[in-house]
Amino acid sequence: IHPTAEDTLVTLGDYVDRGPDSRGVIERLIQLGGETRHVGLMGNHEEMMLEVVKHQAPHEMWLRHGGVDTLDSYAFAGSLDFLPDSHLEFFESLVDFHEERGHFFTHAAYAPKIPLNEQAADMLRWHSLDDMVPQPHLSGKVAVVGHTANKDGEILDLGHLICVDTYCYGGGWLTAIELHSGQVWQVS
């Protein structure tokens, strides 16, 4: 895809822990922020990493879920200040949801009867659609989410909810969709 300065590019999170080059992914997202209107959402993997880096939280869960790959990509040498300042600023700029006309975006899911600005972070970052697919949101907008992998490589479109996680981390596709035209891009 080739977004222009007038385009809004919303990325749904899990930029770290999902492959061998988390650092390169963050560099590219920072670069995109200078080329287009980029809105980055906070995923559960960014949350786990920031809890360790900023709050010295226990690190075992993060390391079990891809943190080792992230540390390797940053050539971790034992100090929790391994993130370059520009990367830490990027992570601190991530939001839990974003709204556009007709759509809203979260990393994982939402509670259908609660306004977006009152949603629990756990719901927005951690809830799996495998556990429960939410009903339409009270805003009437279509939800666009990731987090729950569609292992068949297809976008899940339920009308009121679109899940674009097509299992990139597990060997599937990295997927982008232009919501107004419906055009889809996928790379492996």
Predicted regions and their residues:
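Conserved hydrophobic/aromatic beta-strand scaffold that supports enzyme active sites
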Residues: 5, 90, 97, 105, ...
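Cytochrome P450 core scaffold surrounding the K-helix E-X-X-R motif
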Residues: 114-120
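Hydrophobic "anchor" residues on beta-strands that sit immediately upstream
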Residues: 8-13, 39-40, 103, 142-143, ...
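Conserved beta-sheet core of the metallophosphoesterase superfamily
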Residues: 120-187
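Short, glycine/acidic-enriched loop or turn micro-motifs at the edges of active sites
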Residues: 17, 46-47, 110, 150, ...
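Divalent metal-coordination and catalytic microenvironments
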Residues: 14, 29, 43-44, 70, ...
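Active-site neighborhood of divalent metal-dependent phosphoester bond hydrolases
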Residues: 5-6, 18-99, 125-134
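Short, well-ordered beta-to-alpha junction loops that form the rim of enzyme active sites
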Residues: 101-110, 147-148
